[in-house]
Amino acid sequence: PPAVREKMKLASEAAILCPSSVGQYSVSTYLDNFDWRLQIEEFRGMYRGRRDAMVSALGEFMPTCTWNVPAGGFYVWVGLPDGLDAKDMLPRAVTNLVAYVSGTAFYAGGSAGHDHVRLSFCYPEPVEIREGVRRLSEVVAHDLELINLFGPFRARPTEGVSAPAPDQI
């Protein structure tokens, strides 16, 4: 249940605020005995290929969007076309077997970031990245088609909405 999940998440975060001495010693030993600089270069090449696969797929499948080309890290920020809302679109994306983080997750409140998604190219192989972007493009195209047919969606106020407390779910 959500209430238990949230408590487990907090416990996990509290448990790993500081790595254990054993963990720190293991990392120290690794750094002393292995060519970690070479490994970093290999990782940089791998992530560069994945980043390039994502940027290429965005250019091919999502030309109505904007995006950054990161010089580091493994996330691409994608700006959605006018009228689309990343948070509202997420359930349809998940149904189409692709996920992202809505830009709203990176702001303290309000609707800031609603028109952006953060895509990760850390784990999937380039062929999977391409397929994920293609699937996301289907969701974007579908939502744009709905906006073109019916106009932009405006949520109604939710005054008087009541819901059970998290620990009652």
Feature annotation, model-predicted:
Residues 1-45:
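Conserved core segment of the aminotransferase class I/II
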Residues 1-2, 32, 79-81, 122-124:
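Residue-level recognition of strand-loop junctions within catalytic nucleotide-signaling folds
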Residues 24, 28, 41, 45-55, ...:
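Conserved glycine-rich beta-strand-loop-beta hairpin in the small C-terminal domain of fold type I
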Residues 84-89, 127-131:
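Short, conserved charged micro-motifs
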Residues 95-96, 108-169:
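PLP-dependent enzyme catalytic core of the Aspartate aminotransferase-like
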Residues 99:
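Residue-level detector of anion-binding/catalytic polar loops
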